[in-house]
């Protein structure tokens, strides 16, 4: 047997002894200490005691050292391995030697073990003030005694006072620190409406002291980077106040208006370090950051956390942090308080999908606090990815509310002055970080400079800036593969309804993972959405045939940056689909997703190759025929449509279809070749497409027994049944059909560039103009403005024939009235 002398850290008084066998374990020693002091360690499990060998620099501490209390355990060896034998950790009978009687009488007898006692939580007995709720001073009477003069120890009482003196109530710093933090907040009404019912249920359950998880909603803001998660958390008090007002519960409304907000983050200044601050207490990663918000001097985060960790006698969990705030504000009962706890950047925590990982344990601790908090607490957590959240809560009935930041209406936060600016704002797809990036770029230039700037150069510079902001997308090996880009593009164009954890096409990428890159959204109806500017970068990476790259990239540039006639735009959109679905059988309804069709069940379309766009020089019949050798002539020569590699734009003012091409269908088990004809119809304001008008357009453009016919118009349409293989894209279907291309489609309805005001770069990018013609136009208009087409023809093309004359006829002149 060995006799060990022990003392409690932070407690002044005499040491006490326990008898154990030197072959016993550390766990046995904890049991012996607990048994020796049953009153002092009341309600504390033996395994929660922390033991240290009381030897510093090879010398035992003495009874005299511990009589006034010991607080500093720096440099002492902690006995952490519960199975370790006492003789193996320096506590054998041989090592723990006795001293003579005189040494003992003088108080110089050795103390072998120091005991650190974890503090009890939430003592709520009547008569116990707030200060004593966080360490039970009644169980340790010496804790209430003032420190003795000259003593170097810090009792829990002293640590408590020191901590309180270093803190004060402070409103949280904004989690969103970027340039968009002051933009008017959008979508508040919709979000508040989503919160009304769960907030009211949570409050009622808290008031009735019902801790059932199904009544207490954890609010989860889940969306990709740069979409407004941090901004939503900054706005959370306003959202909760709006929701409470709608609940018609006066007390709830008053509580939310007077709520204290804690905003903690695992990014920026208090970023996660790859491991929890305390493996045994995941709450500390939240509560320490809450207290950091209250710090008067705001020291370095790591230094602050280290200071809190040194207060071993104070168990500073989330409830304790709220109790400290109550003490600072002079609130006598925590139940009178309302707290909104916002936790940003959970995805930064270590996550391996297990219940022992940091992500799971921290989220679980927040939920545990939410369900049993003495104060009325609302908890909101954000992350860029949802799958680990679902895994963490998969076995729990915890009620959860998913909040998605709404797309921004870019023109409301970023005023524009030029046509290219307006288009670029649309291209950001309502993503906050993308709009901030664009705003910074545009701020360096005046309106005149922007109007003279090459749109191609401007677009590329904006893309370069976005690459820095969204590095994960552009550096990802996934997006280096052209076939992956094609699968993603097809997923967007198809308007297919995805579940969050569905895979994209034939890739291993899930919708949730794709969304976590940023610039992608998973819409409310399950559709995959993407900012147009990213869509352009995806299209640039599409697999293309040899010799087709320059042709497609030039076509893409003109479509993205230059005004085009509506039929030119629709032809490009159809071309993109031919590349996205190349060699992939797909339902005709999915190929033309968003359009309204008649009977097309069991019809599959296969694009055998990607297509190019050609323009016929004359008006051609667009109905299919048995003659597979039919050739049409454009400026580049003959075109054989039976090769199924072209989209033909018909000659000007054609009475038949505006676009046509030969397609391969499979109807049931039968393979069929026919024409696909697209008619682009612009109508005067308030005119509608009705059944008779539709039938006339179809009759002159398509073979009614075999061809696929699609009428595309921005006008409204009356309700009528469509014939088999016939489709309609009207005002009701327009946005669904064109998706992220919609703003480009609407732009084609605007008047063409004005010949007297268009910049050199705007003119040269018009199809068929080029540098020489653009320079000639600018030189002539500096002499005198062009009044009308006749004036331009006389001065630029005296013969009034040829390609240039046709191009000039498509421009806008001072005498023209805008024909929208």
UniProtKB/Swiss-Prot annotation:
Q: What is this protein called?
A: Crinkler effector protein 108
Chain span(s) of sequence motif HVLVXXP motif: 112-117
Keyword DNA-binding carried by entry: yes
Q: What is its main location?
A: secreted
**Purpose:** Secreted effector that suppresses plant basal defense and promotes plant susceptibility via targeting promoters of host HSP gene and thus inhibiting their expression. CRN108 binds directly to heat shock elements (HSEs) 5'-GAAnnTTC-3' and interferes with the association of the HSE with the plant heat shock transcription factors, which initializes HSP gene expression in response to stress.
SUPFAM superfamilies (alphabetical): RuvA domain 2-like
Q: Which residues form the signal peptide?
A: 1-17
Residue ranges of the region described as HhH DNA-binding domain = 754-791
């Amino acid at each position: 047997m060995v006799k060990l002398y022990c003392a409690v850290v932070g407690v002044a008084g005499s040491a006490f002894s326990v008898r154990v066998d030197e072959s016993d374990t550390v766990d046995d020693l904890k049991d012996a200490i607990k048994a020796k002091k049953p009153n002092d360690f009341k309600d504390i499990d033996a395994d929660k005691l922390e033991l240290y060998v009381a030897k510093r620099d090879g010398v035992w501490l003495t009874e005299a050292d511990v009589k006034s209390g010991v607080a500093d355990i720096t440099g002492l060896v902690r006995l952490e391995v519960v199975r370790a034998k006492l003789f193996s950790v320096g506590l054998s009978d041989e090592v723990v030697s006795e001293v003579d009687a005189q040494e003992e009488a003088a108080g110089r007898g050795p103390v072998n073990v120091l005991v650190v006692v974890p503090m009890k939580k939430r003592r709520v007995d009547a008569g116990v003030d707030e200060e004593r709720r966080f360490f039970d001073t009644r169980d340790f009477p010496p804790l209430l005694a003032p420190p003795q003069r000259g003593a170097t120890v810090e009792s829990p009482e002293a640590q408590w006072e020191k901590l309180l003196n270093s803190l004060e109530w402070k409103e949280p710093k904004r989690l969103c620190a970027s340039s968009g933090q002051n933009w008017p907040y959008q979508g508040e009404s919709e979000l508040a409406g989503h919160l009304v019912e769960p907030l009211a249920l949570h409050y009622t359950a808290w008031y009735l002291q019902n801790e059932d998880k199904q009544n207490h909603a954890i609010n989860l803001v889940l969306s990709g980077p740069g979409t407004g998660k941090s901004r939503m958390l900054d706005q959370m008090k306003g959202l909760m106040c709006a929701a409470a007002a709608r609940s018609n519960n006066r007390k709830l409304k008053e509580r939310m208006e007077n709520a204290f907000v804690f905003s903690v983050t695992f990014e920026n200044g208090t970023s996660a370090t790859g491991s929890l601050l305390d493996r045994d207490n995941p709450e500390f990663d939240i509560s320490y950051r809450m207290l950091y918000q209250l710090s008067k001097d705001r020291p370095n985060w790591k230094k602050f956390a280290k200071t809190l960790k040194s207060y071993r006698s104070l168990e500073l969990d989330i409830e304790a942090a709220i109790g400290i705030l109550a003490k600072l504000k002079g609130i006598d009962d925590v139940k009178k308080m309302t707290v909104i706890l916002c936790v940003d950047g959970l995805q930064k925590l270590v996550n391996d999908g297990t219940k022992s990982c940091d992500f799971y344990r921290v989220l679980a601790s927040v939920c545990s606090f939410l369900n049993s908090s003495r104060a009325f607490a609302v908890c909101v957590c954000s992350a860029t990815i949802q799958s680990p959240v679902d895994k963490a809560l998969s076995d729990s009935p915890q009620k959860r509310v998913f909040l998605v930041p709404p797309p921004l209406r870019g023109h409301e936060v970023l005023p524009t002055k030029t046509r290219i600016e307006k288009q670029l704002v649309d291209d950001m797809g309502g993503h906050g970080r993308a709009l901030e990036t664009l705003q910074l770029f545009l701020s360096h230039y005046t309106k005149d400079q922007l109007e003279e700037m090459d749109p191609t150069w401007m677009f590329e510079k904006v893309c370069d800036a976005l690459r820095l902001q969204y590095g994960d997308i552009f550096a990802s090996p996934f997006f280096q593969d052209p076939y992956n880009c094609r699968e993603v593009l097809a997923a967007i164009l198809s308007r297919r309804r995805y579940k969050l954890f569905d895979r994209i096409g034939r890739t291993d990428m899930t919708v949730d993972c794709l969304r976590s890159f940023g610039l992608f959204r998973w819409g409310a109806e399950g559709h995959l959405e993407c900012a147009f500017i990213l869509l352009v970068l995806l299209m640039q990476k599409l697999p293309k045939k040899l010799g087709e790259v320059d042709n497609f990239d030039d076509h893409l540039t003109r479509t993205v940056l230059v005004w085009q006639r509506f039929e030119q735009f629709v032809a490009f959109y159809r071309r993109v689909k031919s590349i996205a679905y190349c060699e992939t059988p797909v339902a005709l309804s999915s190929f033309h997703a968003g359009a309204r069709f008649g009977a097309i069940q069991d019809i599959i379309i296969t694009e055998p190759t990607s297509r190019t766009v050609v323009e016929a020089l004359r008006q051609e019949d667009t109905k299919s025929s048995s003659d597979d050798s039919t050739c049409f002539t454009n400026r580049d020569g003959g075109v054989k449509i039976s090769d199924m590699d072209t989209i033909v734009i018909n000659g000007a003012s054609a009475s038949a279809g505006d676009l046509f091409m030969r397609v391969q269908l499979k109807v049931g088990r039968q393979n069929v070749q026919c024409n696909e004809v697209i008619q682009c119809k612009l109508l005067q304001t308030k005119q509608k497409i009705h059944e008779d008008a539709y039938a006339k357009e179809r009759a002159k453009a398509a073979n009614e027994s075999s061809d696929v016919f699609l009428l595309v118009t921005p006008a409204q349409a009356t309700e009528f049944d469509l014939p088999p293989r016939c489709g309609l894209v009207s005002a009701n279907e327009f946005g669904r059909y064109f998706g992220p291309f919609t703003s480009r489609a609407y732009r084609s309805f605007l008047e063409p560039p004005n010949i007297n005001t268009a910049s050199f770069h705007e003119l040269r990018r018009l199809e068929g103009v080029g540098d020489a013609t653009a320079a000639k136009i600018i030189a002539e208009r500096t002499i005198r403005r062009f009044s009308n087409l006749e004036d331009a023809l006389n001065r630029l093309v005296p013969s009034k024939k040829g390609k240039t004359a046709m191009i000039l006829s498509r421009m806008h002149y001072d005498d023209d009235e805008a024909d929208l």
